[in-house]
């Protein structure tokens, strides 16, 4: 029943007519792509491994369903990458190998993933940057293995000392962004 409701929601959004320009999203040239979800996962830890084949089939079937509704637009998963695939490159690759998936996505959140210190990013900035850049390279290589493009569709780093104050420094974040954009 949940999957039926999910597909109803997909159909509603894809066929919705934009209230401003009157164009259905499926026909709107400004809509490049659809994603299955934000950060879909087969599970959140090693206990998710038994779910992988069901997840992989869900990716294939759902991407195919979207493709039927929107054949002129691209389809991807919305995955955060290997980090959201039980940490396994093979799971990430297999989920994106479906012919219904046009390109790979991945996200990069080094503080969330404990590659950098949330409250003091500068303390582990060098090692966090090294790990982040290696993560990018891994995903570019995986996409090449599948012969598909990839998109780093989310990334970020906190202000210095984890502050939300606009007056707080962004030294570590600036260095992080420079490294990511240079890659």
Regions found by a protein language model. Give the residues of each.
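Active-site mouth of glycoside hydrolases
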Residues: 1-116, 124-149, 155-181
């Amino acid at each position: 029943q949940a999957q039926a409701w999910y597909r109803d929601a997909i159909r509603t959004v894809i066929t919705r007519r934009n209230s401003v320009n009157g164009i259905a999203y499926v026909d709107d040239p400004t809509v490049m792509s659809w994603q299955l979800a934000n950060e879909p996962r087969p599970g959140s830890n090693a206990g998710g491994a038994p779910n992988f084949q069901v997840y992989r089939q869900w990716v294939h079937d759902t991407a195919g369903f979207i493709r039927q509704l929107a054949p002129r637009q691209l389809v991807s998963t919305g995955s955060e990458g290997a980090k959201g695939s039980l940490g396994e490159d093979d799971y990430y690759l297999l989920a994106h190998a479906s012919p219904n998936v046009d390109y790979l996505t991945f996200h990069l959140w080094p503080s969330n993933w404990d590659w950098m210190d949330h409250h003091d990013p500068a303390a582990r900035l060098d090692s966090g940057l090294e790990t982040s850049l290696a993560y990018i390279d891994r995903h570019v290589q995986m996409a090449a293995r599948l012969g598909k493009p990839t998109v780093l569709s989310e990334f970020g780093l906190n202000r210095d000392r984890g502050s939300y104050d606009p007056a707080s420094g962004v030294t570590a974040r600036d260095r992080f962004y420079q490294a990511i954009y240079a890659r």
